[in-house]
């Protein structure tokens, strides 16, 4: 493809390489380093004048450093006369801070949107935003892609009894997500209502729906410390589920998450590779990964060629 350049930030170079390989491109030359005072320095190592530039950087790992690196890369390309700069952010940072839920709370997702725009981003490509209204925080186009087609494909190919399963949301907020998957599989859905007293601590769970003698598949957009999904798995087993799976778009897995998964009753915890999982998989055999590089690569190809990306909302590209 002419007049296109793809650069990778340091957060997830493996995913960036897979995207570039699928597009038949080489990653652009970029050098990132830190000065002795920990300031981030980025050097774009090739001309981007008149080019359609895509910068891949996920909101994971050292999130603040990686966000700053992305902003600097966007700005460096913009002032070097790139014709368009698109930030490809598989896991959007600060997405959970999307509303003012208590006095004096910041809306940090809006701040990040402002920063990306001011840095010079012309377009954002992301996946499974924690709150879809974050798209409205931008005055530039945002393509919020979905892992759902890849999740459906994984369920059909890897769970032999998928016709006898129930899709379960671990909270009321995910009801729309699980009903969509359940409808497309033509199976039932359930949800778990949770009463939470402190952040990351679940007090009481109430199952709404039937999982008795069925395979229960927990579906959520992200899991951090995994307290919620591990409690939910216990609840589902006690309600008569034969087996329990968890399928998540963004596997953050911080703090005690890995030990909780190892001690939980999951057959498998399936995540996409919006966040690197290699190190975590070494410590937890239950973690399996769905590759979504083909979805992001096809979104980039269609964007570059001026084509619609809505096909990707219901299909997995080959």
From Swiss-Prot:
**Cofactor requirements of the protein:** Mg(2+)
**Gene3D superfamilies, from UniProt?**
3.40.50.2020
Give the result of residue 142 to L, as annotated: Found in a patient with an intermediate phenotype between ARTS and PRPS1 superactivity; likely pathogenic; normal PRPP synthetase activity in fibroblasts; loss of activity in erythrocytes
Q: What is the effect of changing residue 114 to S?
A: In PRPS1 superactivity; no effect on Km; resistant to inhibition by ADP and GDP
Q: What does this protein do?
A: Catalyzes the synthesis of phosphoribosylpyrophosphate (PRPP) that is essential for nucleotide synthesis.
Q: What is the effect of changing residue 52 to H?
A: In PRPS1 superactivity; no effect on Km; resistant to inhibition by ADP and GDP
- Cite the effect that the entry attributes to residue 219 to G: In a breast cancer sample; somatic mutation
Enzyme Commission identifier(s): 2.7.6.1
Lineage here is: Eukaryota, Metazoa, Chordata, Craniata, Vertebrata
Subunit structure, as described in the record: Homodimer. The active form is probably a hexamer composed of 3 homodimers.
Region Binding of phosphoribosylpyrophosphate, annotated ranges: 212-227
* InterPro entries from the UniProt entry: PRib_PP_synth_CS (IPR000842), Pribosyltran_N (IPR029099), PRibTrfase_dom (IPR000836), PRTase-like (IPR029057), Rib-P_diPkinase (IPR005946), Rib-P_diPkinase_bac (IPR037515)
Keywords assigned by UniProt?
ATP-binding, Charcot-Marie-Tooth disease, Deafness, Disease variant, Gout, Intellectual disability, Kinase, Magnesium, Metal-binding, Neurodegeneration, Neuropathy, Non-syndromic deafness, Nucleotide biosynthesis, Nucleotide-binding, Retinitis pigmentosa, Transferase
- What gene does the UniProt entry assign to this protein? PRPS1
Q: Name one GO molecular function term.
A: identical protein binding
Record-given protein name? Ribose-phosphate pyrophosphokinase 1
Reaction catalysis annotation:
D-ribose 5-phosphate + ATP = 5-phospho-alpha-D-ribose 1-diphosphate + AMP + H(+)
Catalytic EC class: transferase
Where, in this chain's numbering, is ATP bound?
Answer: 96-101, 130
